């Protein structure tokens, strides 16, 4: 009888202990659920340098309870579409002239430029010559096929003394706007990400810095001719219209204009990329 009473007391004690642990566990879960939850912001970016720059701001955003997820893209179309469709919260890969042209072609998109971050001077590259003055007659030249970067490439070729464009066309220039082509250059319009792959097939290629760097080219070393620091093509952070004042977006904007980001750009890219703030 005594044994039975002792056994029952121990069993009751064990049941109470397990019940208490279960309640404590449930209570902890409720506290976490009711506490301050981590906010997530997804930003689409080109791998180089945009995603690398975003990695720098992750720790600062984490201090504010914001988890930054970087979604890498290797084209110039999907990031804007994904932002508009709410698949991501923002994108960081393009300059203002490109955005304006893209929205003109896709008027259903409601996107806003909220911040300029850096400039990527476009350059002229070659695997066949070492100096821009060595460009031969009839040389094949690959340039970006999208309108704004194609026009930008033609302007750079004009600055390099290789051709002359119709007056006033600016960044909207096309191959048809070339009015003086003394070397009879032959143009190949290629999607911007593919331009580095054309270097073995053409004489010169005009390449955006991000794609050049992704192909292990060093602009300040390998470019035959580059845009200068006055380039108007500032790379920007883009969000959906109406999201400009979201706390997470504001925190991201502040972090991207920090001294940490400026120092990172200057130290890592050594003039190939220039802070715009």
Predicted regions: what they are:
Residues 101-114, 128-129, 201, 206, ...:
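Ligand-binding "clamshell"
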Residues 35-48, 66-72, 140-141:
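Short, well-ordered beta-strand elements
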Residues 27-30:
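Bacterial signal peptide processing site
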Residues 149-158, 256-276:
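Periplasmic-binding protein-like
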Residues 70-81, 169-197:
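Short helix-initiation/N-cap motifs at beta->coil->alpha
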Residues 22-25:
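C-terminal motif of bacterial Sec signal peptides marking the signal peptidase cleavage site
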Residues 121-132, 234-246:
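A bilobed periplasmic-binding-protein/Venus flytrap-type ligand-binding module shared by bacterial periplasmic
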Residues 114-163, 262:
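A conserved helix-loop-strand patch within extracytoplasmic ligand-binding domains
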């Amino acid at each position: 009888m005594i044994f039975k009473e002792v056994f029952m007391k121990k069993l009751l004690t064990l049941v109470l202990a397990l019940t208490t642990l279960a309640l404590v566990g449930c209570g902890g879960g409720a506290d976490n659920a009711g506490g301050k939850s981590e906010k997530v912001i997804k930003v689409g970016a080109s791998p180089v340098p945009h995603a690398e720059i975003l990695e720098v701001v992750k720790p600062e955003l984490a201090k504010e309870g914001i988890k930054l997820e970087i979604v890498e893209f290797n084209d110039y179309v999907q990031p804007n579409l994904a932002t508009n469709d709410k698949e991501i919260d923002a994108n960081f890969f393009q300059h203002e002239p490109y955005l304006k042209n893209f929205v003109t072609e896709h008027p259903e998109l409601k996107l806003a430029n909220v911040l300029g971050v850096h400039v990527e001077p476009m350059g002229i590259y070659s695997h066949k010559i070492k100096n821009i003055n060595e460009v031969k007659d009839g040389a094949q030249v690959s340039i970006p096929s999208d309108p704004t970067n194609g026009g930008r490439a033609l302007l750079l070729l004009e600055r390099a003394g290789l051709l002359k464009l119709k007056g006033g066309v600016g960044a909207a220039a096309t191959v048809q706007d070339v009015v003086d082509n003394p070397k009879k250059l032959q143009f190949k319009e290629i999607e911007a990400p593919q331009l580095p792959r054309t270097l073995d097939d053409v004489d010169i290629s005009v390449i955006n810095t991000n794609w050049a760097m992704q192909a292990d080219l060093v602009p300040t070393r390998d470019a035959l001719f580059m845009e200068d620091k006055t380039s108007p093509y500032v790379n920007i952070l883009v969000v959906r219209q109406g999201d400009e004042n979201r706390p997470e977006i504001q925190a991201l904007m502040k972090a991207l204009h920090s001294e940490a980001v400026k120092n990172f750009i200057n130290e890592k890219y050594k003039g190939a990329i220039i802070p715009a703030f």
